[in-house]
Design a protein with these regions (language model features):
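Short, intrinsically disordered, charge-balanced linker/junction segments flanking boundaries
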Residues: 149-155
Length: 155
């Protein structure tokens, strides 16, 4: 039986999530890929402002529980700051992999992406995801590029 309220919210029928529009980073993309892994039917919307009546998971925008763009953003004991992906993984990882494997995955995969997002420290996977962002003169939408990147991240 699921005791994780966030996991229940993600897995419910007609589940929804919201994140920022515009340029995206690996933490946004892997957050969306994680949500889609847990519920392939979840609707993920991007926008400039979270609608007041939105009832779903909000990440990397809106100053909520899964947004790290705040003055009092959390930092791990080892000094690596959380980004959206790390905040979601912290809440969901143990349910998915168990405590020991979730911690190892956090250290090896999530933390480097979080660190890249917060500090700009070089990360090849983050650079790959960043390359999906359209150039200023390219056709197509940021949303289309975002969901292409999410598709690659979810492979």
């Amino acid at each position: 039986m699921e005791t994780n309220t966030l996991l229940k919210q993600i897995r419910q029928e007609h589940a929804a999530a919201f994140t920022h529009s515009g340029k995206f980073h690996a933490d946004d993309v892997f957050s969306a890929a994680l949500l889609l892994y847990l519920n392939p039917e979840i609707t993920i919307t991007r926008g400039n402002k979270v609608p007041e009546d939105f009832e779903g998971v909000v990440f990397d925008i809106g100053r909520g529980q899964y947004d790290h763009h705040q003055k009092d953003s959390r930092i791990r004991e080892n000094g690596v700051p959380y980004a959206a992906f790390g905040l979601l993984w912290e809440a969901l990882g143990t349910e998915i992999l168990g405590e020991e494997l979730a911690q190892k995955f956090d250290e090896a995969f999530v933390q480097p992406l979080d660190n890249n997002d917060n500090t700009g420290e070089k990360n090849e996977l983050a650079a790959l995801i960043g390359n999906f962002n359209p150039t200023w003169d390219a056709g197509g939408s940021n949303d289309e590029a975002f969901f292409q990147a999410v598709s690659v991240a979810g492979m």
